[in-house]
A protein has these predicted regions:
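Conserved N-terminal beta1-alpha1 strand-loop-helix module at the mouth
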Residues: 1-77, 91-95, 178
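Hydrophobic faces of well-ordered beta-strands that scaffold small-molecule active sites
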Residues: 2-8, 49-51, 76-80, 96-100, ...
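Glycine-rich, proline-tolerant flexible connector loops at the mouths of alpha/beta enzymes
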Residues: 47-67, 72, 102-115, 163-174, ...
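Alpha-helix-loop-beta-strand connector modules within alpha/beta enzyme cores
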Residues: 58-84, 118-138, 175-199, 242-247
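Catalytic cores of alpha/beta
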Residues: 84-93, 144-154, 199, 203-217
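Glycine-rich phosphate-binding active-site loops on the catalytic face of alpha/beta enzymes
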Residues: 99-107, 158-170, 215-235
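Histidine/lysine/aspartate-rich catalytic loop segments that bind and position anionic ligands
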Residues: 136-189, 193
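C-terminal helical cap(s) of enzyme catalytic domains, especially alpha/beta-barrels
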Residues: 171-176, 229-248
Length: 248
């Protein structure tokens, strides 16, 4: 069975759109609460929760993560950059796993995979430090053979393949098949290297039909489409629907 990790970042995005200048990020009239929505997602069948604490704190705050941990029922996958500050925060929070991602302050969302090869010394240092503190680390990368090999070289136990190009190409059959084959080859190489392979970015209720055909996929991390659907159907139904699609 393919596992479903639910990314809750955009619950925090909605809150910050209205209350980012408040001294507190929760309580009283400040809503929605990312921690509460994460608990709802767990009750609805999520196998894990992903939260991305960015350096610019544009959505999820450290306090959101800590509050979620108070009552969490599954596991926390914390997305962070490789900065010294964020690595220290990860060690303080002690999530069940960390996923290292690139960050660009001008981007709306993560635009591509981490360049592990081009930052291999720092990536190796971060993986070693977090692993020594009992936190397994994955690398959010494009399905590029060199990036997969670099991830294996530094001792990352798994990777998350960036599916954004596939998601954008879904409505163009020629491009869709090309991107799906690229992901499939990335999956094959990852497995040969002994990596566990997750995937995510841009997966929705339509293109998941193609994405789930990837052999050996362990887990999808999905956020925006689930949160978007929840505005119509509620978060519990949105998680349950995605869970059922993965199980078909």
């Amino acid at each position: 069975m393919i596992l479903l990790g639910v990314n809750i970042d955009h619950v925090a995005t909605l809150r910050q759109a209205r209350y980012r200048d408040e001294e507190e990020t929760f309580g009283g009239f400040i809503e929605p609460d990312p921690a509460e929505m994460a608990w709802v997602a767990e009750e609805a069948g999520a196998d894990g929760i992903t939260m991305h604490v960015r350096e610019d704190r544009r959505h999820v705050q450290v306090e959101d993560v800590k509050r979620y941990q108070e009552k969490m029922k599954t596991r926390l996958n914390l997305e962070i950059s490789m900065s010294l500050e964020m690595v220290q925060i990860a060690q303080e929070i002690q999530p069940e796993s960390v996923c290292l991602v690139p960050e660009n302050r001008k981007e709306v969302t993560t635009e591509g995979g981490l360049d592990v090869r081009g930052n291999i010394e720092r990536a190796h240092e971060v993986v070693r430090e977090l692993t020594q503190n009992g936190i397994p680390v994955s690398m959010f990368i494009d399905p590029d053979p060199d990036q997969l090999e670099a991830s294996a070289e530094i001792g990352a136990p798994w990777v998350e393949l960036h599916t954004g190009s596939f998601a954008r190409a879904w409505y163009n059959p020629e491009k869709r098949d090309l991107e799906l084959n690229t992901l499939r080859e990335g999956m094959r190489i990852g497995v040969e290297l002994g990596l566990r392979v997750n995937a995510g970015h841009g997966i929705n209720y339509e293109n998941v039909e193609g994405a789930k055909t990837l052999e050996s996929i362990y887990e999808f991390n999905i956020g925006h489409s689930i949160i978007s659907r929840s505005l119509r159907t509620g978060l519990a139904e949105s998680v349950q629907k995605m869970r059922s699609l993965l199980n078909e």
